[in-house]
Structures are given as C-alpha cells and as structure tokens.
Swiss-Prot record:
This is Imidazolonepropionase. 4-imidazolone-5-propanoate binds at R82, Y145, H178, Q246, S323. Binds 1 zinc or iron ion per subunit. One of its GO terms (molecular function) is zinc ion binding. Its cofactor is Zn(2+); Fe(3+). The lineage of its organism: Bacteria, Pseudomonadati, Pseudomonadota, Gammaproteobacteria, Alteromonadales. Fe(3+) binds at H73, H75, H243, D318.
Length: 410
C-alpha cells in the first residue's frame, strides 16, 4: 500500500456511529492517510503492509486520537469588550438599564462599525489560535454585530479571510437579524426589509455566507419576521439555522423544523412539541453551556426529552463579548456534563460528529472514517472521558489537518 503517513501505537475514538461501542473506539489501532483523507483505520494487527522506508510513521505512545474538534456556534469576529457591563451587572444593574445607557449588543455594534478589517482580522486570528491549541479544526463564525449592510459585509469578509489564512476551516453564517439597531428601534419590519432586500443579496453576491441565522425571541424578531429571512435564505440555496427558545418558548424551533433548518441553538425553553418537530426534520439541537453559565441562567435545556426523541445534541462555545466571552471549546465539554448532565461521550459527540451535522459537513468531517478529511488530534489521555473531566492543562499533543501535521500557535 502507498500512503502519505501512518499512525500507530494509538487508541482511536472514531466517533463513527457505525462502529459499535462507546465513542466508536478502536483500541490498539492504526490510521493511514492519503491525499488529505483517511485511507484506512482499524486494529494495528490488521494494518496492510506498506513501504515503511518511504512512509512517515508517527507513534502515539499509547495516546488517544479523536476527530478534530468543531465549534459550531461562535460570534468570534468582533471588536471591543463588555467587561464594564459585567461589573455593572454584578453590582445590580439590569440588562435593560445597561442597554438604555448605550451598552449591551449596541456597544459591540458601535465598536465593530468603527473597527477596520485589519483590526478585526487580528483579533479573530488570536481567537482562532486559542481554539487551535485545544484541537479545534473547524469553526463556525457568525456576523451580527454590524446591523447595517456595510458592517455585516465587513464582518463576513473578515471571517472568510480568516478561513483562507488559518489552518482551521471556517464556516460563515450571516446573522444580520441579530438585534434591532437603534435607527430601526420602532420599526423592526423595516429592518427586516433591509436584511432581506439589501443585506442578503449583497452577502450572496460576494459569496460570504454558508448559512443564515436569526435571533427569534421576544426581545428581537418574531416568527413572521424570522420566517421571511429564513425563507429568502433557503430560496437562495443557503443553509438555515436559528437562535430559538433561549428566553421564552415562541415556537421558533417548530418553524425551524418546518423550513428544514440544520440546527436550533440555545433552546433552554424548548418544549416537547418543538422537540418532536426537530426530531422529525433531522434538525440538531445546539446547546450553549457557556452562555448558560455566564448569564447565571436556571432554566435547563430539556436533555432527557432530546435523548428520548434521539435529537443530535451539539455543544458549542457561543463565544461572544456579551453572554459567553469564553474562547474554549474544551471547557464547553466540562460545562455540558456538569451543568447540563450530558455524558462525556455525548459531549464529545457534540463537538465532533453532531457539530458536523449542524454545519452540514458531516459527509466530510466529524468522525474518523475512511474517505473523510484527515482532521484529527492526538491527546495525552488514558480515556476519552478525560477531555470532559479535567480542564486547565492542555492535553492536545498533535493536530493533523487535511492530512498535514500542523504547528500549533503559541
């Protein structure tokens, strides 16, 4: 056999659902890579003969290999921070009081409108580097901090550029309907007109988005407004997803299911009818424990019902300056287990195969399966559960992206 590289002396958590047992484990395994793809994976004892002298062989010293991690929900491109608001909230100020004083999401919008692309790119690069050190190989990045055509396009251009210049793959999402900007505060319908008739065509013309998202909530956009945006996006051939049921149960998830959305995200207030709907549509449920933790929420997402209806559960950081300023996918594994009561296996599924499903790329990444992209990580652990168990020491030893061993940034 002719391969570009071979990995031996490893245990592999394939996360391939076709392999029986927890994590899709293959103990004492080997992996072969050819042309950036997984060419062979299985027990070391069954590895076909190959030219050892002509093939780089990597020894894992008994460590574990998992698929490269995927963070399927971030707002990673932004300027400024809201540490002052964090302090104000701890001193008793309400979100409404902060917003009336010019804070909240609008403060980030103003910072992003003022920032140039070079500044936003450098900030985004630093954040991608932080995720890369944790074994992340694919990241979704949303816009949504522009709320006008010029700045929304700027944010998406930066996200695309980050994907072109970093080893991490970047999936971009247009979230123009993230909040109602001050200039439209009394006319949300008119702002949705702008999103549908001006922003979305401009985004499509520059091929800046892989998907479109809307914040469907009583403090943002109603069902009718949400459907307008998602329908227009779907008609344009873009994938759709939804922020839904974070603060109230508005029925956004049922709408998402009707329209064939890839995921509904947050979903603390999702009810059984909504769960049944997304189960039937194949829509993923994206859990965001970082926001739950940072906002000190108390309404837990309906984990048992999601299990009952076999809805794929995704775990993501929701990294953003307001409700989850936590740039760590690994920490989300621990939070998903400790706060939401997921098992370590469910948590790891949530940042591998299920995250890939939420982004519509599970045919190419998310598990260590022959034919898929060779994106994987070598960890200095004794069991995959260790990734969710402990936090603070980086156990990621090596990352392979598209079949190439990458140098992790300092």
């Amino acid at each position: 056999m002719s391969w570009d590289q071979v990995w031996i002396d490893v245990n592999v958590a394939t996360m391939d659902t076709n392999i029986q047992g927890a994590y899709g484990v293959i103990p004492q395994a080997a992996i072969a890579v050819k042309d950036g793809k997984i060419a062979w994976v299985g027990p070391r004892s069954e590895l076909p003969e190959f030219d050892v002298l002509a093939t780089p062989v990597y020894r894992g010293k008994g460590g574990w290999i998992t698929p490269g991690l995927i963070d399927a929900h971030t707002h990673l491109v932004f300027a400024g921070n809201r540490a002052n608001e964090f302090e104000q909230r701890l001193q008793g100020a309400t979100y409404a009081e902060i917003a009336r004083a010019g804070g909240g999401i609008i403060s980030t919008v103003n910072a992003c409108r003022d920032a140039d692309e070079a500044e936003l790119f450098e900030l985004g690069r630093q954040r991608l580097n932080a995720l890369a050190r944790e074994g992340v190989t694919t990241v979704e990045i949303k816009s949504g901090y522009g709320l006008n055509t010029e700045t929304e396009l700027k944010l998406l251009r930066v996200a695309r550029e980050l994907g072109e210049h970093h080893h991490i793959d970047v999936s971009t999402t247009f979230l123009g309907a993230h909040a109602i900007p001050p200039e439209y505060k009394d006319n949300a319908d008119a702002y949705i007109d702008l999103v549908v008739n001006d922003m979305l065509p401009a985004v499509i013309a520059e091929n800046l988005a892989d998907a479109v998202d809307v914040f469907c909530e009583n403090i943002a956009f109603n069902l009718e407004q949400t459907e307008r945006v998602l329908t227009a996006a779907k008609q344009a051939g873009l994938q759709i997803k939804l922020h839904a049921e974070q603060l109230t149960n508005m029925g956004g998830s049922a709408l998402a299911a009707k329209l064939g959305a890839k995921s509904v995200d947050h979903i603390e207030f999702l009810d059984e009818a909504g769960i049944k709907a997304i189960s039937e549509s194949g829509t993923c449920a994206t859990l965001l424990p970082g926001a739950f933790y940072f906002l000190r929420e108390t309404q837990l997402p309906p984990i048992d019902l999601l299990r009952q209806y076999k809805v794929p559960m995704v775990i993501a950081s929701d990294f953003n300056p307001g409700s989850s300023p936590i740039c760590s996918t690994l920490l989300m594994l621990n939070m998903a287990c400790t706060l939401f009561r997921l098992t370590p296996e469910e948590a790891l599924q949530g940042v591998t195969i299920n995250a890939a499903k939420a982004l519509g790329i599970d045919n190419n990444v998310g598990s260590i399966t022959v034919g898929k992209q060779a994106d994987f990580c070598l960890w200095d652990i004794t069991t995959p559960a260790q990734l969710a168990y402990a936090y603070g020491v980086n156990l990621c030893k090596t990352v392979v992206k598209n079949g190439q061993v990458v140098a992790l940034p300092n």
